């Protein structure tokens, strides 16, 4: 039977009415199958998450010892400006993550006043060395304690240093090997003090940290002794910083007993 162009199929009949918002709530999954529709979003999300993680790990400033994550020790280093030197083997560091590339010293200022620095620096104990003890708590100063302090000030105060951190000590200081750039060379601060006879190799029975440099430190100490440099050339009976501390600790215990 011939079908007229304007005729309709017998199956064509009234269509069931659709709810007005059916098409609004329907998810077009075909849209998400197209890479061009979801790849940019995935890349943007991944980039943002990576940037946040990078900032938290490498660019977030650490204002004090208590803010250092335990996982950082023996894995990370701290870069910053030395703001004060309190003794022959310790100082305070203002953490400047990223250095000049992150804007420090030209876009972001580093405080210099003591009041502005309060609670914002990290105390650092130089690993592997022991400098002569200065006078404090009513105790006499050791020979060459003033020279050791003066050398450390002239060598690192106001300079940027990198500290490879190992642990936190009983005084809430960070123990680490400290490096400073002098002209075009990077110098191990502790090693330079030993070479000049201004510090001994750290000889405590527990808590000694060397970062794999103990042999190098002891060789440098032997040379300084042989040349009678610094404290090794002093007259009279030699008392190491460790022996000095042990003597005063024994005296304090005897007074309490």
Swiss-Prot record:
- Which Pfam families does its entry note? SNase
Query: Is Metal-binding set as a keyword in this record?
Result: yes
Domain TNase-like, by residue range, is 76-234
Q: How does it sit in the membrane?
A: Single-pass membrane protein
Key words, A-Z: Calcium, Endonuclease, Hydrolase, Membrane, Metal-binding, Mitochondrion, Nuclease, Transmembrane, Transmembrane helix
Predominant location = mitochondrion
Enzyme class (EC, first level): hydrolase
Q: Which residues cross the membrane?
A: 39-55
Segment Disordered: which positions? 236-257
Q: What is its EC number?
A: 3.1.-.-
- Keyword Nuclease listed: yes
Q: Where is the composition biased (Basic and acidic residues)?
A: 236-246
Task: Name the residues that bind Ca(2+).
Answer: 130
**Any one Gene Ontology molecular-function term assigned to this protein's record:** endonuclease activity
Q: Where in the cell is it found?
A: Mitochondrion; Membrane
Q: Which SUPFAM superfamilies match?
A: Staphylococcal nuclease (SSF50199)
User: Which GO CC annotations does the UniProt entry carry?
Assistant: membrane; mitochondrion
Q: Which domain of life is it from?
A: Eukaryota
Active site as annotated? 125, 133, 173
Similarity comment: Belongs to the LCL3 family.
**Stored PANTHER family:** EBNA2 BINDING PROTEIN P100, SERINE_THREONINE-PROTEIN KINASE 31
What is the designated name of this protein? Probable endonuclease LCL3
From the UniProt record, report the name of the gene that encodes this protein. LCL3
